[in-house]
Regions:
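N-terminal leader/targeting and assembly helices and adjacent pre-domain segments
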Residues: 1-155, 246-275
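Acidic, glycine-rich two-metal-ion catalytic cores of nucleic acid-processing enzymes
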Residues: 154-258
Length: 275
């Protein structure tokens, strides 16, 4: 697979997942001293409400979004050196973190901080279910407590990985889109990670031209259960990403274009009429 400047570095996702996992597993130390499993849920909720925990969640979110923003700017600079929209791109980059780009930047930080802050509450719900199951099975309170503490690292790791994988991609798509549309570029090429793990409903989207304002429902296009309409990278567990169309000469026509609810093969002239 050839290098693509718009593809997010996997290290950002890994670092984010590890940081979230470390933060959540740090709460486990407070749980080890509890004698009763019935105190675990209330303790987790109490710890999650502490200002220190909330500040740490905000710091992790800001670190991830800032790293993505920095990498995204580098990608746009590379695009400016090559594409026909170079002057417009440079002009936009000179504005820095202002306008709608700043709004999106702050929204992404707030959203991610909220996801991390709510993670202990999700774990608390899981703990409640484990306690109820243990009680129904007639297990001793001490055994239920030990079982919960044994599973806690696995739960926190799984949740951390899901948040990191989903939210880093969503943030990348949001940052790419807001910059593209500030320049006046509404079209992009849907790119997949081009490996065996690409879901079937996304593999047929590879290379298709999409308008950011009119995203497809990839599942509906192949008669599968729909998760709604969304852009590349903008749904759970998705590793796809948008490659902004900065130069129409980069596209070999006829080309696949998503338009009017379907994927169509279009000539250059046909595409120019809807562009």
């Amino acid at each position: 697979m050839k290098y693509n400047k718009w593809k997010m570095k996997r290290t950002i996702e890994k670092a984010y997942a590890n940081a979230i996992k470390k933060l959540i597993q740090g709460l486990q130390d407070e749980l080890k001293n509890l004698d009763s499993p019935f105190l675990i849920t209330s303790t987790i909720k109490s710890l999650a409400r502490q200002p220190t925990f909330i500040k740490k969640a905000e710091a992790l979110a800001k670190g991830m979004v800032t790293q993505l923003f920095s990498d995204n700017v580098k990608s746009w600079r590379q695009a400016a050196n090559k594409g026909s929209q170079g002057k417009m791109i440079y002009k936009e980059l000179q504005k820095g973190l202002t306008g709608q780009i700043r709004v999106t930047f702050n929204e992404l930080i707030n959203q991610n901080a909220n996801y991390i802050s709510s993670l202990p509450l999700d774990i608390a719900k899981y703990v409640d279910r484990r306690i109820a199951k243990g009680v129904l099975e007639g297990k001793r309170a001490a055994d239920i407590r030990d079982e919960i503490l044994r599973y806690y690292p696995h739960i926190s790791e799984t949740r951390a990985q899901l948040i990191a994988r989903t939210e880093t991609r969503k943030a990348q798509t949001a940052l790419t889109r807001v910059r593209a549309q500030a320049i006046g570029l509404n079209w992009y090429v849907w790119r997949t990670s081009e490996d065996s793990r690409v879901r079937k409903s996304h593999s047929h989207m590879e290379g298709v031209l999409i308008n950011f304002n009119y995203p497809p429902s990839p599942e509906r296009l192949i008669n599968k259960k729909s998760y709604g309409n969304y852009n590349a990278g903008d749904i759970f567990n998705c590793r796809c990403y948008p490659e902004p169309l900065t130069d129409i000469n980069d596209i070999k026509f006829p080309h696949k274009v998503y338009y009017g609810g379907a994927i169509r093969n279009m000539t250059k002239n046909q595409f120019l009429k809807i562009m």
